[in-house]
Amino acid sequence: LAILAIASLSAAAGTGDAVFNKAIAAYKAAKGIAVKYSMTGAVGNSSGEIIMQGNKFCITASNMICWYNGKTQWSYSTMSNEVSIMEPTASELQVVNPFSVISNFQTAYTATLMKGNASSNIVQLRPKNARTSQFSQVVVTIAKKTNLPSKIIATMRDKSKISITLSGYRTGGNFPASTFVYNKKYVPAGTQVVDLR
């Protein structure tokens, strides 16, 4: 949060674009990625692992599992003991998976480079269409060594914030398609499935 309060803009949006385009290239070059995450803020606190490949992902945490195969999303919650099925919009995906900000950057956001440090660049993203975006802004810290995000702070339209720290990247994976599709063996027997499509 201090970053948002004290960081000064240090370059034009085009420079922010260049930094973020490097992040997009690094994400694509990494192919399959697994990364540990820790999240705090408006939607509660959680930690776990995100596995990503192209536009697919699987998020595993202590209280939920979420699968997305590029079209359909299955979300299991330990609190409700049910699996919900939906076909999310691009805007909805950004709330579930922070890396969706990267894949939607060129069409959805304008980038400005902020004051970083010796090891990281910091880029502020503002939505091109504020009415349809879930966020009013997203600040992404990108490691210079890997060009991959290490922290994401998203400000919702109601001014609440979500902070996500990313660490322990494993790249170059080749995950089977089944990784990103709901499998009942990962949830308790008798779990209710609710189809919201």
Label each region the model flagged:
Residues 31-33, 46, 55, 62-64, ...:
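Envelope-exposed proteins and targeting segments
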Residues 47-96, 162:
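An acidic-aromatic
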Residues 88-120:
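Flexible, surface-exposed loop/linker segments and immediately adjacent secondary-structure boundaries
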Residues 109-111, 116-187, 194-196:
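Gly/Pro-enriched, hydrophobic low-complexity segments
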